[in-house]
Amino acid sequence: MRINPTTSGPAVSTLDEKNLGHIAQIIGPVLDVVFPPGKMPNIYNALVVKGRDTVGQQINVTCEVQQLLGNNRVRAVAMSATDGLTRGMEVIDTGAPLSVPVGGATLGRIFNVLGEPVDNLGPVDTRTTSPIHRSAPAFIQLDTKLSIFETGIKVVDLLAPYRRGGKIGLFGGAGVGKTVLIMELINNIAKAHGGVSVFGGVGERTREGNDLYMEMKESGVINEKNIAESKVALVYGQMNEPPGARMRVGLTALTMAEYFRDVNEQDVLLFIDNIFRFVQAGSEVSALLGRMPSAVGYQPTLSTEMGSLQERITSTKEGSITSIQAVYVPADDLTDPAPATTFAHLDATTVLSRGLAAKGIYPAVDPLDSTSTMLQPGIVGEEHYETAQKVKQTSQRYKELQDIIAILGLDELSEEDRLTVARARKIERFLSQPFFVAEVFTGSPGKYVGLAETVRGFQLILSGELDSLPEQAFYLVGNIDEATAKAMNLEGENK
């Protein structure tokens, strides 16, 4: 009987028995390997190619079986560059899926997709490892408690609050601030949260990965003097990696997070930047595996691949995984199959708008497009819910009036509409906020605003108590008291 690696426990490597095959064909990152009759590896088994290239350099490439082709051939995807591989090279079947180190030994370290440390800080204790392919927790193991996760970011906490143990997506095109927002969330939550975090860098810029590492060392989330006291494990498979690595690095990060949840019974934060690159890597590999492309050229297995990752990110009775994922939106088109498939799995969506970014309003979160299943009076309370709805109504009315203002000017509006526009512009500016991680760029110190303070501030604007203050007083401030103080300063400067 053959064990299915997706449901089996941690398998034991069988390198001693050495089930050997050899390379028959290489197409970019995809290899065809021939094995002796009756010795075919299972799907998802890890294969290792060891040898020397034509100039005598040592080669060590790990691949993952994706398809059984018949005639004793399997098709596998390489997790690192296939440069130097030649036909006829020997391939060893490890007899198990890729396994990565898990547990306390991973904290404060940077890993690649194979679970190998890449931070030059020496080897990692690999006594506890776990396979990256597992089935999702059973339905009866899931936890259904509803509670809010406070982030300290006004626009998020008020209009699209995050669920503790839920899945959150940050949607935006290129350059509207997804990574900065994720770094601010790491700064605010990972520090206040006290639990452990796992960061999966999937197909993003290496520079950003480096910046994040340096920032975490500065803020103490990674403790350089005593690595074991660090609060985060980092797993990177960046833009320069082959598609096999980018396709699996999310699973490596998730496997580490699952261990903290299931074995250590902790509440874990899982950051993934960027989930779109996971889909993109699958799409790159799909055609080479001989699959017919589906909508917009994506892989036909898009929703299955996404589901197998997302369904494992969940809260059980042992502990919770709260996942925050950045989602790149190609050409700002939210109907593209990649972001559209991601939407289905999320509890809250934070949509970033290029229009707001162009106005200089950061975080550029669209108050009308962003949604959350948590924004219900029974969960957040009547006061919060009413305030959020009024803010949305005012913003919506302002959006409707913009065409009239552009053609006829403000003077043609009724008194009531003019007041709505003035308040909406104040709300728009008050939704901006200085970030801790952006202090170097903006020069203004970051602000954390509690939920009660946020609700109070917007209630004051909506009630009309602050109608006399200039709108620039609300731009890039923390709570409402800072806005009134800024207004007094502006008044003093103008005299």
From Swiss-Prot:
GO cellular component, one term: chloroplast thylakoid membrane
UniProt binding sites for ATP: G172, G173, A174, G175, V176, G177, K178, T179
Transmembrane segments: none
Subcellular compartments: Plastid, Chloroplast thylakoid membrane
Biological function: Produces ATP from ADP in the presence of a proton gradient across the membrane. The catalytic sites are hosted primarily by the beta subunits.
Entries under PANTHER family matching the protein: ATP SYNTHASE, ATP SYNTHASE SUBUNIT BETA, MITOCHONDRIAL
Name this protein carries in UniProt: ATP synthase subunit beta, chloroplastic
Gene from which this protein is expressed: atpB
